[in-house]
């Protein structure tokens, strides 16, 4: 029961371009929360887009990219374009750290060469902004992706991603609202369907909770699932 809960939401986390169908389906979810007795309030998040994107690349490189870089000499033909770029990112960062000088990623305009300590400092700044919000409310809602889908064969480093007629500057990160919460990894996050887009692909929302408090996140997801039991509805099952 989430009656009398306070739920915060942000449609774009402050800087994402959001597809109109994603926005509509997110609003539908917020309306369902109101039907369940929750109070829903919009909040403003002042995160720096460029700082987050730079940090995300560097942070991921420190976490796992070096292991991919080690595989490239013998297994490059088995890796996706994305995996190869991640491995290349690791080698650029290692070079930048040795030279103690930032190097700009040629295809993305990302500044590489942040230490893991510097990445964690940015994550700390992010939490200074978001922490007071999540502690004031019982839960936080935002879209999972800003578009219903990208093409299955998209090359994230060469192809364009257009949302609402606007080409977004970061075709790899500019449509996924997940990565900020990957950097704030102490926060439990559950993604659930929010509805269908006109192309038949489901859209989603993220339910974010307080640090290490998983149960309230599942409570919100469970209550919404009872209103729309996706797994029982034939219209959402593939015709195979």
Language model features with spans:
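Amidase signature
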Residues: 1-176, 184, 223-240
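A generic structural motif
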Residues: 14-15, 209-213
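Short, well-ordered beta-strand elements
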Residues: 201-210, 217-218
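Active-site-proximal beta-strand/loop segments in catalytic clefts of secreted hydrolases
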Residues: 144-145, 193-195
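A short, aliphatic-rich beta-strand micro-motif
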Residues: 188-192
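AMP-binding (ANL) adenylation modules
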Residues: 149, 195-198
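Residue-level signal for well-ordered, solvent-exposed loop/turn and beta-edge residues enriched
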Residues: 166, 199-201
């Amino acid at each position: 029961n989430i009656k009398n809960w306070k739920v915060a939401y942000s449609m774009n986390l402050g800087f994402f371009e959001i597809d109109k169908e994603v926005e509509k389906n997110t609003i539908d979810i917020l309306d369902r929360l109101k039907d369940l007795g929750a109070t829903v309030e919009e909040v403003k998040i002042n995160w720096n887009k460029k700082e987050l994107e730079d940090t995300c690349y560097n942070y991921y490189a420190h976490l796992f990219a070096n292991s991919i870089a080690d595989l490239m000499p013998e297994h490059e033909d088995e890796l996706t374009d994305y995996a190869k770029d991640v491995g290349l990112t690791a080698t650029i960062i290692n070079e930048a750290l040795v030279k103690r000088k930032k190097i700009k990623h040629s295809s993305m305009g990302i500044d590489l060469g942040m230490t893991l300590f510097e990445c964690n400092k940015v994550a700390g700044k992010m939490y200074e902004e978001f922490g007071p919000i999540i502690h004031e409310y019982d839960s936080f809602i935002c879209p999972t992706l800003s578009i219903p889908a990208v093409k299955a064969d998209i090359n994230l480093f060469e192809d364009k991603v257009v949302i609402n007629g606007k080409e977004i500057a970061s075709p790899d990160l500019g449509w996924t609202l997940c990565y900020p919460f990957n950097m704030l990894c102490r926060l439990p996050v559950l993604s659930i369907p929010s509805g269908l887009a006109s192309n038949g692909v489901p859209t989603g929302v993220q339910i974010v909770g307080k640090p290490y408090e998983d149960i309230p996140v599942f409570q919100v997801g469970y209550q919404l699932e009872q209103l729309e039991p996706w797994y029982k509805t034939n219209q959402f099952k593939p015709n195979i």
